[in-house]
Amino acid sequence: HPYIGFHNPEGSNTGEYDDDCDIDERLWASAELLRTDTTHRDTYLKAFEKYSSMTHPEVSKTDFGWTDVSGMATLCLLTDPGNTCGATRKREYEQILFTEADRLIELQTKSGFELSMQPEDFVWGSNMVVCNRSMLLILASLCSEGDTASRYREAALNQLHYLLGRNALDISYVTGEGEHAFKNPHNRPTACDEIDLPMPGWVSGGPFKTPCDPAAIAAVP
């Protein structure tokens, strides 16, 4: 295809989840195939090495978001008991993982809520960032031992504490969980089921740094 990427087609009026890079998707795919299909391992290893060596601003190897899924490749490789990527690549990915995990712990030391977030991280759907960083810290814990593993695990729990109420609003961002759980998710099935309380277990998108509706713009300086 002459253009690799995604933008909403003409006439679409919904929010755009655009993506101009497919290196992360191909990296993840090659990692999964390398791990699961032994019949074409050389082919998949060659592809994995190719995409591992590529660099792009949107490919971090530590993110589990919708724009950058390259962290899924890291998750796949570092939980592979067969170590099919080879010892050298495994050490490389472990170092990338631990470097980012240590950065996230450093952010918690600067946060009043022990949260691995900076002001610029509160994007649309910021709780996805909170959850994804918790996943990364859990993976770092699983790849470590002793006090180091415990340190990463506690940092992951701090992310969960934030979601369940240890935040500036004193609310749980998970419906049905906690005394002050949020009750009005933007979700059509739970809005039309004729039950006042929302379905339990939905996670709010969370705070957004940029007010974008009239009520928020009027209330926030």
Segments (PLM) and residue ranges:
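Internal amphipathic alpha-helical repeat/solenoid segments
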Residues: 6-8
